[in-house]
């Protein structure tokens, strides 16, 4: 399931503007995953952007950055025994730090970037397509469809929540009711929201003539 809060833009008192063609200035998205055969406990993923920071964990010293330098573009992995904090999403080497609940702190070695061929990962993808499924080129991909597909589905679930958040209807008094600000329940097998039909308009689209696959 997925739910979110988003930053709104106001050009008139008490009336949030609606810009469906663009993204909000900030958002906080929560995605909940049930237990599976590979992961026997439920898991929660929280995404923030637009300047929204997550709460600073108690076990991380107040003056330590969370994520990257300046607490910018980072990841916190919160587990049963401690928290891993690392930078991400830039050209710098990853510098993970482990904070244990028993008070110990460990600093991981800087990671090295994997060698890339000319034209980068795009070339590797083309080579894998030419070589075929289960080929050496396919198995060496750093973002194979096997997990890139479900990961993309996860990201798009957050977008579904964001796009649904500002859906509104005018009530009998002439005021706007934001009826879609709720937790969205996702049926992955059938690719649809089960508890808010209006949100399913964002799952797919009518493609222009000549662009169907």
Tell what function each PLM region has:
Residues 1-144, 149-202, 206-213:
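Glycine-rich, aromatic-lined ligand/substrate-binding cores of catalytic
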């Amino acid at each position: 399931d997925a739910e979110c809060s988003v930053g709104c833009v106001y050009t008139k008192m008490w009336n949030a503007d609606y810009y469906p063609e663009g993204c909000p200035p900030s958002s906080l998205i929560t995605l909940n995953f049930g237990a599976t055969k590979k992961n026997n406990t439920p898991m929660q993923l929280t995404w923030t952007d637009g300047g929204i920071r997550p709460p600073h964990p108690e076990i991380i010293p107040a003056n330590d950055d969370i994520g990257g330098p300046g607490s910018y573009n980072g990841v916190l992995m919160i587990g049963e025994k401690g928290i891993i904090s690392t930078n991400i999403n830039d050209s710098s080497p990853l510098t993970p730090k482990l904070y244990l609940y028993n008070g110990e702190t460990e600093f991981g070695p800087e990671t090295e970037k994997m060698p890339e061929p000319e034209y980068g990962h795009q070339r590797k993808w083309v080579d894998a397509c030419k070589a075929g499924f289960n080929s050496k080129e396919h198995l060496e991909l750093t973002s194979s469809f096997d997990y890139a597909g479900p990961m993309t589905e996860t990201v798009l679930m957050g977008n579904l929540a964001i796009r649904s958040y500002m859906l509104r209807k005018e009530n009998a008094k002439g005021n706007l009711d934001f009826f879609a600000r709720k937790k969205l329940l996702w049926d992955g097998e059938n690719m649809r929201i089960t508890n808010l039909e209006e949100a399913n308009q964002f799952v797919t689209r009518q493609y222009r003539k000549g662009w169907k696959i």
